């Protein structure tokens, strides 16, 4: 059995409902509904969720670990939420959050406007910092990757949009 799939999920103040091959996790920050693979059994025991494969096949074993991680992320998301921090490095690079839009000046001849999907918010504590928050880990990471994709850090000066914990290894310029 999967090592990840064996460990139970503590619900930490989240409500869980199992119905029709789907699990609904409800917490103070919102609600997430996730389809459950038919190769995985989910049992709710007094504040913990236990997952187990239906049979001993490799596929069911692998999916029990995957489903456990997805459900654990949903529980974490509705109780504490997820956030990803981005930093803008470069002269004149700045960001401004306006409602559900993120306006970016990244050295192009035009401003870049990124529309935030539902359930994801962007904040700009300073002009060169962006904090993307939401309850869905996959969505938060996807939006952060899209924003970074507008101007990824270049290897010679390091200018561009980078994750705050990202280390950009700079190359040396060509010598004559």
From Swiss-Prot:
GO biological process: cytoplasmic translation
GO annotation, cellular component aspect: cytosolic large ribosomal subunit
Listed InterPro entries: Ribosomal_uL6-like, Ribosomal_uL6-like_a/b-dom_sf, Ribosomal_uL6_a/b-dom, Ribosomal_uL6_bac-type, Ribosomal_uL6_CS
Keywords for this protein: Ribonucleoprotein, Ribosomal protein, RNA-binding, rRNA-binding
Gene3D superfamilies: Ribosomal protein L6, alpha-beta domain
UniProt GO molecular function: rRNA binding; structural constituent of ribosome
Subunit structure: Part of the 50S ribosomal subunit.
HAMAP family per UniProt: Ribosomal_uL6_B (MF_01365_B)
PANTHER family: 60S/50S RIBOSOMAL PROTEIN L6/L9, LARGE RIBOSOMAL SUBUNIT PROTEIN UL6M
General function of this protein: This protein binds to the 23S rRNA, and is important in its secondary structure. It is located near the subunit interface in the base of the L7/L12 stalk, and near the tRNA binding site of the peptidyltransferase center.
Family: Belongs to the universal ribosomal protein uL6 family.
Protein name (database record): Large ribosomal subunit protein uL6
Lineage of source species: Bacteria, Pseudomonadati, Pseudomonadota, Betaproteobacteria, Burkholderiales
Gene label: rplF
């Amino acid at each position: 059995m999967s090592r990840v799939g064996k460990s139970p999920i503590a619900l930490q103040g989240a409500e869980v409902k199992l119905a029709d091959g789907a699990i609904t996790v409800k917490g103070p920050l919102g609600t997430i509904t996730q389809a459950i693979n038919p190769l995985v059994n989910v049992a709710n025991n007094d504040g913990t969720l236990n997952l187990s494969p239906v049979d001993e096949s490799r596929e069911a074993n692998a999916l029990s670990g995957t489903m456990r991680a997805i459900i654990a992320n949903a529980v974490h998301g509705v109780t504490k939420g997820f956030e990803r921090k981005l930093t803008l490095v470069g002269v004149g690079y700045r960001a401004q959050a306006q409602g559900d839009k993120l306006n970016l000046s990244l050295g192009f001849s035009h401003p870049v406007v990124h529309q935030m999907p539902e359930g994801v918010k962007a904040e700009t504590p300073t002009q060169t910092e962006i904090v993307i928050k939401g309850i869905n880990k996959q969505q938060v990471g996807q939006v952060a990757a899209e924003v970074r994709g507008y101007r990824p850090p270049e290897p010679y000066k390091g200018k561009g949009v980078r994750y705050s914990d990202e280390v950009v290894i700079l190359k040396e310029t060509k010598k004559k």
